[in-house]
């Protein structure tokens, strides 16, 4: 066990020889509420998820791991590929005794959630993809970097020191190589194999995830739907947590959409 952030507590779990840090909510959720696992984006670790974790904690048990190599988790000498990060996420979920959960990813975390739903469907009840990357129409480092620069103008200032600190902690080599792995991941090919209810959430001001790409993601998911949060940037998990929590609660309380062929 470890330090606390108001309403959240730290824990470390050994997975594949690595100590994995996670934050979890300390409130007792309503009986029967599904656990939600928050999967962070590129480099920023679970610290970026704290506002959303606090917003969801009264209704659900929240778990927010730092993927190996990021945040307070142990850093392996090699940079893990997306498939390896996904395997670690699955192993961590089992090690925590979570038989089945809702997985909510942000940005590159969405790519891991999609991989998990395809490779380990027994663990996944529903998925929420908030700002899913990488748009195949802009799958180069130059294009994505320009989109990230544009997005930084719309993000709340409190995210900047968190992001810079976490980027420094994970190191430039790990950050750039993970970025490269994400660029090489054809998420669009995996989406039709996600066989659980799926919610895609986009901020209307998000230049990283265009409206066209968000619609394509939802259309490719057999049980997918799209919600757009007005004037929201890319990182809704940090900058619009109350609005995002509201649409997540609505999604989880609604009956599953009928599966369609895609």
Question: What is each residue range found by the language model?
Answer:
Residues 18, 23-72:
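Conserved HGGG/HGGXW glycine-rich cap/lid loop of the alpha/beta-hydrolase fold
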Residues 83-101:
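Conserved acidic catalytic loop of the alpha/beta-hydrolase fold
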Residues 99-138:
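Conserved hydrolase catalytic core segment
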Residues 160-189:
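Hydrophobic, aromatic-rich cap/lid helix
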Residues 193-194, 200-202, 206:
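Short beta-strand/loop motif that positions the catalytic acidic residue
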Residues 207-213:
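Conserved alpha/beta-hydrolase "acid-adjacent" motif
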Residues 218-235:
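Catalytic histidine neighborhood in serine/cysteine hydrolases
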Residues 232-245:
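Catalytic histidine-centered segment of alpha/beta-hydrolase-like enzymes
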């Amino acid at each position: 066990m470890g330090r606390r952030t108001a309403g959240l507590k730290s824990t470390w779990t050994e997975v594949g020889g690595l100590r994995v840090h996670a934050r979890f909510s300390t409130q007792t959720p309503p009986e029967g509420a599904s656990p939600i696992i928050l999967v962070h984006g590129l480099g920023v670790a679970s610290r970026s998820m704290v506002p959303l974790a606090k917003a969801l904690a009264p209704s659900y048990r929240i778990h927010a791991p730092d993927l190996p190599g990021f945040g307070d988790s142990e850093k392996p000498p090699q940079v893990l590929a997306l498939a390896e990060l996904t395997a670690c996420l699955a192993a961590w979920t089992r090690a925590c005794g979570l038989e089945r959960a809702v997985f909510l990813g942000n940005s590159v975390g969405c790519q891991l959630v999609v991989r998990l739903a395809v490779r380990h469907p027994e663990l996944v009840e529903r998925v929420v993809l908030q700002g899913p990357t990488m748009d195949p129409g802009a799958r180069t480092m130059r294009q994505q970097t320009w989109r990230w620069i544009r997005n930084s103008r719309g993000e709340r200032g409190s995210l900047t020191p968190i992001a810079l600190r976490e980027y420094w902690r994970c190191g430039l080599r790990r950050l750039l190589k993970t970025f490269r792995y994400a660029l090489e991941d054809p998420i669009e090919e995996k989406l039709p194999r996600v066989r659980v209810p799926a919610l895609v959430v986009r901020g209307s001001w998000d230049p990283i995830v265009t409206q066209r790409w968000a619609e394509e993601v939802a259309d490719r998911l057999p049980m997918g739907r799209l919600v757009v949060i007005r004037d929201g940037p890319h990182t809704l998990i940090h900058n619009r947590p109350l609005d995002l929590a509201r649409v997540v609660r609505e999604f989880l309380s609604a009956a599953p959409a009928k599966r369609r062929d895609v």
